[in-house]
Amino acid sequence: MSVFSAPQFARTLEIPQVLIAPSIDPLSDKNRELGTGQIEDILQQLGIHSDKPMVTQISRFDRLKDPVGVLEAWRIARRRVDCQLVLAGGGATDDPEGAVVLREVREKASDDPDVHILDLPPTANIEINAIQRASTVIIQKSLKEGFGLTVSEALWKSKPVIAGSVGEIPLQITHKYSGILTHTVEGTAFWIKQLLSAPEFAQSLGANGHNHVRNNFLRTRHMRDYLLAFSYLTGDRSDVIRL
């Protein structure tokens, strides 16, 4: 049996194939609930002030995550709505260009006090959690993506998410219902402005996104899918209850 995370990754094979999407752990440091005081303490340690709406992208500094495009979109949106930008992440061990991209992003930011560029270690899970929970809008402007589970991590925090319509991100976001899908810098800028200007709509997107993740991308669903797959392999399907 072969397991694929999405239909587009499946192949024509002579053995059975199953689709099992990845999932997030809601009890992990990256996703568990945090107190308001704890969030504020972490923001203070990172040098981020909560006096302005926060637009955030959490991703490694990789051209395919388009951090420069996020910066450009934020600058366009800021002409209409006052806000700050957080670009937080790190480099991947298999991406030697990460340091180059990080340097390029810092140069483009030009010491703007409203831009916070954080090169975080791989263990900074609580910090990422706090940043996301303090954010007003979260972006995942990928130009190319696999499943993109960082989108589900953001949706789990009940935040409105603007993401590139690539890879399996559309499985996680239904446009204008559980998030926003975009294709360009200008489109991203438009939706940043719209969501910051329409908090009730932004809140409804966040609530719908949270429910979508709760129903489809948590560990419990992941375990259920594998148990059903194991039952299929044993050949005894008389006691299988499909939920």
Regions found by a protein language model. Give the residues of each.
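Conserved donor-binding/catalytic core segment of Leloir-type glycosyltransferases
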Residues: 43-65, 71, 85-86
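Nucleotide-activated donor-binding/catalytic signature segment of Leloir-type glycosyltransferases, i.e.
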Residues: 89-93, 97-130
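Short alpha-helical segment that forms part of, or immediately flanks, the ligand-binding pocket
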Residues: 129, 152-156, 167-171, 177
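Short hydrophobic beta-strand element within catalytic cores of glycosyltransferases
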Residues: 160-163, 173
